[in-house]
From Swiss-Prot:
Main location: membrane
Source organism (scientific name): Novosphingobium aromaticivorans (strain ATCC 700278 / DSM 12444 / CCUG 56034 / CIP 105152 / NBRC 16084 / F199)
Top-level taxonomy: Bacteria, Pseudomonadati, Pseudomonadota, Alphaproteobacteria, Sphingomonadales
Record field: transmembrane: none
Gene Ontology cellular component list: plasma membrane; proton-transporting ATP synthase complex
Leader peptide range in chain numbering: none
Alphabetized UniProt keyword annotations: ATP synthesis, Cell inner membrane, Cell membrane, CF(1), Hydrogen ion transport, Ion transport, Membrane, Transport
Membrane topology: Peripheral membrane protein
Cell inner membrane keyword on record: yes
InterPro entries in UniProt: ATP_synth_F1_ATPase_gsu, ATP_synth_F1_gsu, ATP_synth_F1_gsu_CS
Protein name, entry field: ATP synthase gamma chain
Length: 290
């Protein structure tokens, strides 16, 4: 049985940890509001850009000399998984869920006879994937060098991916990233970004719009921007998901610390009471012996 001194030390240690988790919870809650607003504000832009892309793509569909980013390499053999993880921990099961989704996609592609490589964004997802796919890491981008990764970082990632695509390093690229629902729910989703998938929005396709200077010229400009926008959206969703998961995890940790403090306090009081009772019995026994 632990001594009173040891129990007191454990109680103080858990109280110190509780203060840290409570502070982290409050910081994450403050950051979440800003991150959630940014992620939600970017969604309409991405949606509208996809509609414009659909309208343009419908006009140039079937052309053999169309943009490479839309028609692809003509092969479906080499697949690149762009996995977007966080740079920091203490955010519950967010990163493990993203890694699980990436490995699930990789196994499905390999079962179909495809070749799979990875492009890693974020520090926390590197070790598990490197361990299982030591020779399957094509490249990566370190977003931990900036406090809050934004459009510039998304553009740099997109530029490197496009360079790899044009160099013939892969045929299809999929983006594996978290999608923020709320503070309790962040779901990993997989989206094809290269080549740009065919549009499914019939409203956008049926719209009668005349483009100047021409559909192909505009597509050549918009396709890289579309890839950048998808990555930028993933970074925003990642930030909101990270703060939401962190707030929830730290709230659970704070509650668990409180429960542990209560249990240790009860144990401490019982041990103290037992020690006092033992001393009284010894004193009474000694007095009776006299």
């Amino acid at each position: 049985m632990a001594s009173l001194k040891e129990l007191k030390g454990r109680i103080n240690s858990v109280k110190s940890t509780q203060k840290i988790t409570k502070a982290k919870q409050m910081v994450a809650a403050a950051k979440l509001r800003k991150a959630q607003a940014a992620a939600e504000a970017a969604r309409p832009y991405a949606s509208r850009l996809a509609e414009v892309m659909g309208s343009l793509a419908a006009k140039v569909a079937g052309q053999d000399n169309g943009p490479l980013l839309m028609r692809g390499t003509g092969s479906n053999q080499r697949h690149l998984l762009v996995v977007v993880n966080t740079d920091k921990g203490l955010c519950g099961g967010l990163n493990s869920n993203i890694i699980k989704e990436a490995k699930l996609q990789a196994r499905a592609l390999e079962a179909a006879g495809k070749t799979v490589t990875f492009y890693l964004v974020g520090k926390k997802g590197r070790a598990p994937i490197r361990r299982d796919y030591p020779n399957g890491i094509a490249a990566g981008y370190d977003t931990s060098l900036v406090r809050t990764p934004g459009f510039d970082e998304a553009a740099a990632i997109a530029q490197e991916l496009l360079a790899l695509f044009e160099a013939g390093k892969f045929d299809v690229a999929h983006l594996v990233a978290p999608e923020f629902k709320n503070a309790l729910t962040q779901l990993p989703v997989t989206t094809q970004i290269i080549p740009v998938p065919a549009p499914t929005n019939t409203v956008a396709i049926d719209a009668v719009v005349e483009y100047e200077p021409g559909e192909e010229e505009i597509l050549e400009e918009l396709l890289p921007r579309y890839v950048t926008t998808q990555i930028f959206g993933a970074l925003l969703e990642r930030e909101a998901s990270e703060q939401g998961a962190s707030m929830t995890a730290m709230d659970n940790a704070t509650r668990n610390a409180g429960e542990l403090i209560n249990k240790l306090t009860i144990q401490y009081n019982r041990s103290r009471q037992a020690a006092i009772t033992t001393e009284l019995i010894e004193i009474i026994a000694g007095a009776e012996a006299l």
